[in-house]
Amino acid sequence: MNFQLNGRALRHAPTPVRRILHSSAFIEGWAHYAEELCVEEGFAAGDPRFAVGVWLEALVRITRLACSIGVHSAGMTVSEGAARFEADTHLSGPAALSEARRATFDPTYGRYTWGKLEIMKLRDEARRQWGAGFTLNRLHAALLNLGSPPLGLMGTAIVRG
């Protein structure tokens, strides 16, 4: 769904640069944000399994970000990363070890959470700046009109929105 919505927005982006260049952190962050937004907006509210699934995956994704940072800048070992996955998520044994190993060769696998957190920060800022004029539709339209921007340029959505 995130690729469909983002893909549709990309086809209508106002410039060729915005239609062609893509930020994986934005795309994956948008997907993670949309999952959480579904819970916030009450999707499947009568079935707690949906929310539990979203939160379980969020734990895996935030642990990926922590391990990626740990392995690449704080001297975390693969064994320590696997232990972190076992302590903080539902993963254990080979699954936890596989996730920890991934941090050694894919330093961007934390981009899901990073992108989501930046979008949520932007949402809070838009709410603050736009006041009573804030709506999710307005924010999402302004954001998707940028195409698939690098995270550092998402703030222009507030100015243009």
Model regions and ranges:
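N-terminal maturation segment of proteins
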Residues: 1-161
